[in-house]
């Protein structure tokens, strides 16, 4: 059981490391702690925190840095969101208050505003995507092994693309595959359809197709076209500012994930959207890939009958969580207000 002073030391180590990026030693803590404590006492407290796995020693310094477990404890029990500055709040209101002709423009601008305010990478999922469901899928033969794939959603949107079907897939096999799609996936939100394409649907198709890849490519591409426009990413290049040369592999992983199909991005954001407060997931907790040196802060925003969207910040593990959590909480409220005002023009 940690003492109040030891928790105060942990909180201060995280604050100082977040601000400087440098390991924190007992002398620095003695100067910065809001209570007078001897250097020896601080060293004992640091030893207790290290034994608990909350801080760790670096090879290049006698100071300590927070561990992933330490960050998690801090986020679960100690973090206190900081109030957004007047300047940042004014910027958010001014930028979101501009004239927009489409909902997508507001959501697209939101990630630019957030990435500019934080210097991190912002990701947003528009509210309507949570309500868009698959209502039908069919293939129309065009001859010469070509088909037109038609995907229909409950908001009246019809996506169609022309594809070349591999000669190895017969028309009977295609019909069986289409029946599986309509039996298993119709009525589901597009984000869930995308996830099932990566999990259990391929094994179902294997019962009728020698290789389901050709059919999955056709269906997956037209599905991506129907939903990908609802995802927006701002500040991609900001990743390069806090991932050094030694993290080039991590940079490649996250870039490929952002550019992949929207099912991967949905999984990164935590799956189908639910109304939740601001949440933080650390690198090892992220899916579908472990991003060891990164953290993701997510927050949902509710637009009444028009659905629930999500806004997220992707940044380094040592980001200032108190400030970012406070900012994201206010930002989602302002974004929800702006979208509600936008929809009010159509609901009258």
From Swiss-Prot:
Gene Ontology MF annotations: DNA binding; DNA-binding transcription factor activity
Family per similarity comment: Belongs to the HrcA family.
Superkingdom to which the source organism belongs: Bacteria
Protein name, UniProt field: Heat-inducible transcription repressor HrcA
InterPro entries hit by this protein: DeoR_HTH, GAF-like_dom_sf, HrcA, HrcA_C, WH-like_DNA-bd_sf, WH_DNA-bd_sf, WHTH_transcript_rep_HrcA_IDD
Claim: Transcription is one of the keywords in the record: yes
Free-text function comment from the UniProt entry: Negative regulator of class I heat shock genes (grpE-dnaK-dnaJ and groELS operons). Prevents heat-shock induction of these operons.
Gene Ontology terms describing biological process: negative regulation of DNA-templated transcription
Record's keyword terms, sorted: Repressor, Stress response, Transcription, Transcription regulation
């Amino acid at each position: 059981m940690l003492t109040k002073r030891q928790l105060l030391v942990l909180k201060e180590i995280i604050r100082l490391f977040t601000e400087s990026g440098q390991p924190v030693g007992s002398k620095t803590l003695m100067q910065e702690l809001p209570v007078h404590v001897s250097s020896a006492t601080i060293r004992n407290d640091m030893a207790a925190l290290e034994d608990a796995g909350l801080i760790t020693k670096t090879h290049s310094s006698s100071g300590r840095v927070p561990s992933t477990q330490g960050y998690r404890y801090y986020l679960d029990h100690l973090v206190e969101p900081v109030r957004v500055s007047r300047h940042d709040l004014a910027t958010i209101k001014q930028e979101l208050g501009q004239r927009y002709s489409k909902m997508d423009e507001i959501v697209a601008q939101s990630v630019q505003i957030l990435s500019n305010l934080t210097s991190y990478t912002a990701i947003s999922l528009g509210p309507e995507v949570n309500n868009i469901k698959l209502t039908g899928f069919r293939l129309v033969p065009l001859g010469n092994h070509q088909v037109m794939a038609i995907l229909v959603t409950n908001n009246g949107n019809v996506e169609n693309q022309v594809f070349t079907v591999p000669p190895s897939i017969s028309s009977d096999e295609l019909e069986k595959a289409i029946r599986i799609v309509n039996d298993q996936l119709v009525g589901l939100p597009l984000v869930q359809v995308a996830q099932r394409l990566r999990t259990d649907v391929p094994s179902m198709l294997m019962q009728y197709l020698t290789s389901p890849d050709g059919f999955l490519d056709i269906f997956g591409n037209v599905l991506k076209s129907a939903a990908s426009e609802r995802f927006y990413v701002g500040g991609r290049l900001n990743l390069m500012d806090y991932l050094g040369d030694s993290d080039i592999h991590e940079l490649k992983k996250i870039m490929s994930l952002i550019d992949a199909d929207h099912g991967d991005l949905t999984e990164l954001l935590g799956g189908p959207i639910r109304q939740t407060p601001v949440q933080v997931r650390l690198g090892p907790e992220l899916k579908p890939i472990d991003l060891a040196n990164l953290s993701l802060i997510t927050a949902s925003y509710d637009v009444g009958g028009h659905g629930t969207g999500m806004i997220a910040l992707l940044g380094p593990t040592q980001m200032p969580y108190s400030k970012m959590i406070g900012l994201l909480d206010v930002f989602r409220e302002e974004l929800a207000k702006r979208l509600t005002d936008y929809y009010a023009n159509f609901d009258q």
